[in-house]
Amino acid sequence: VSLLEAFEPVAHDLRAAGLDCQLAEDPNPGEPAAGATAVLIVSGVKVGRLTLGASVLDTASRTLYLAAQTQRLVQGNLSIGGRVIEWPPCLPSHAHPMMATRGQRAPLWTCPLGGEVSVPIGQHP
């Protein structure tokens, strides 16, 4: 599974939150043996580089790895009106984002307060 294919569930969840996203070719990709890279652009802002190591083989692990990277890049490098983007949002009563975790069958976005609330990555409302 390519970086683009593994990223598609993450892209769905960005779009569900009203954030436009695209991957652009990395102008400095480095050694091909190190894995695939792409530049992540969210709402018109280049937020950073995604990397997918060659050793990350299964689709669920690839998606989980990209989701965690994307979350760090969005929270660290994107703000709207001076406000940090808490993505992906948790319950409306929670003032924090969900976190990427490994589920039994699929990668999940999970509430960091106990983990009782979760949704598969790619199905965030």
Protein language model regions, located:
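Long, charged N-terminal interaction/targeting segments
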Residues: V1-Y65
